[in-house]
Structures are given as C-alpha cells and as structure tokens.
C-alpha cells in the first residue's frame, strides 16, 4: 500500500493521508480532487520526481501535472536524488511510517483508520518546533482559490501563434512535424517567437520547450 500525502509547506498542515494500492494517476487524482474541493487550490505543489508526478515526456509532463497546469497550479520539482530539498516532508513521512505502518494493519480499512488518527493528532495536537511550537491546525488558512466546476481553456497573448496538438501528439509547424506528447492530444498550445526563428512553446503558462525552426529541434 502506498501512502499519498499532501502537506501545506509553511504551516505543516497535513491535508491528506490516503492509503492507495499504487502510485497510478487515477488514485492520486481522486485524492487531490477531494482535497482541492475541501481546502481550495494551492498556488504551487512541490513534489519529488517519482510517479505519478514526472515522466520522460517533454518538460517531464505527466497526466497529473497536465491537470494541475489546467487548474493554474504550478509544479515545483525538487532536483533528482535530492530528498533534502523536501526535508520537512521526508521527516514527516518517516514519522508516519514508524507510527502507522510498522507493523501494518490487518487490512486497508484498518490502515486508513491509522492514517486518519495520525493526521488528526499531527494537525491539532502536536506542537512543531519549525512553527514556534504551535500546531499546524492553529495556523492553517484555507486557500481562497476554489476548485472550478470545469477546466478553463488557455488564453495566450495576442502575439502568440496558437496550434492544436494532433491525435498522435504531433505538432505541425512551418512544414515541420514535431512530436510533443500524447498527454497533450487535442490541447491548444501557444508559440511565442523570442528570437529570429526561435520559439517558446507554452501550455497555459507552462513553458514546454524551445523550438529552433531551422533545425526542427526542441530543447529545454
């Protein structure tokens, strides 16, 4: 069983601890949809580079951060093999495992009860040195950004050239056919010329890549 955790960075408030059978997209999204509806949308989410957060697609896109981008949520990835960049989260995760997972509960329902109990105590009973020996629940403030009923279409500046990604994840641009990502099939992207023949490719406000139209090559 995988534990899916969501934590407010500044207050240490633990938004969710859910036991999932895998790191697959569907389970992670279901947890996040619930969290976003209850607590509002964050401005940015920090994560490691594992599934379901990062893939080998352009800009490391995954189904999850495509959805975040559509919601106007930024994605801050720590550097590969640098868990110290997410130190407080890693420490909390170790504490969670020590107190709830070893030994494991008899079944998934019992394990979730342990997770729920840990979250309640962590948020409302335990003082934390990093926040002045206060509890996370005493400092937490709900986000004012609400989960939208439907996703908004991207709006690009007027000087951008707009294209729709084709069914096979390809982009046809100036007599060149370039592969972007199957994760973007049907999505509208914006191209902004930043130098002679050099273009920035955007998905909403996310920079996907730079394109040199002379060579047809994409770069980070």
Positions of PLM-derived features:
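C-terminal, beta-rich DNA-binding module of retroviral/retroelements integrases
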Residues: 123-220
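RNase H-like DDE/DDD metal-dependent nuclease/strand-transfer catalytic core used by mobile genetic elements
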Residues: 1-3, 9-121, 210-211, 215
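Hydrophobic alpha-helical segments, especially N-terminal targeting/anchoring helices
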Residues: 7-8, 193
């Amino acid at each position: 069983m995988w534990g899916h955790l969501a934590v407010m960075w500044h207050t240490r408030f633990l938004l969710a601890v859910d036991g999932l059978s895998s790191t697959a997209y569907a389970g992670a999204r279901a947890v996040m949809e619930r969290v976003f509806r209850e607590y509002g949308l964050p401005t940015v989410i920090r994560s490691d580079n594992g599934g379901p957060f990062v893939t080998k697609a352009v800009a490391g896109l995954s189904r999850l951060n495509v959805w975040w981008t559509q919601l106007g949520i930024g994605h801050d990835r720590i550097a590969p093999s640098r868990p110290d960049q997410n130190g407080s989260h890693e420490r909390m995760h170790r504490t969670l495992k020590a107190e709830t997972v070893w030994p494991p509960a008899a079944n998934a329902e019992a394990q979730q009860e342990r997770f729920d109990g840990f979250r309640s105590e962590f948020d409302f009973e335990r003082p934390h040195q990093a926040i002045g020996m206060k509890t996370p629940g005493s400092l937490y403030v709900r986000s004012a950004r609400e989960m939208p009923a439907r996703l908004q279409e991207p709006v690009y500046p007027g000087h951008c050239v707009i294209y729709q990604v084709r069914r096979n994840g390809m982009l046809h641009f100036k007599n060149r056919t370039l592969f972007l990502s199957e994760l973007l099939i049907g999505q509208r992207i914006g191209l902004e010329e930043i130098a002679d023949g050099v273009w920035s490719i955007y998905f909403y406000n996310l920079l996907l890549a730079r394109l040199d139209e002379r060579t047809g090559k994409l770069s980070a």
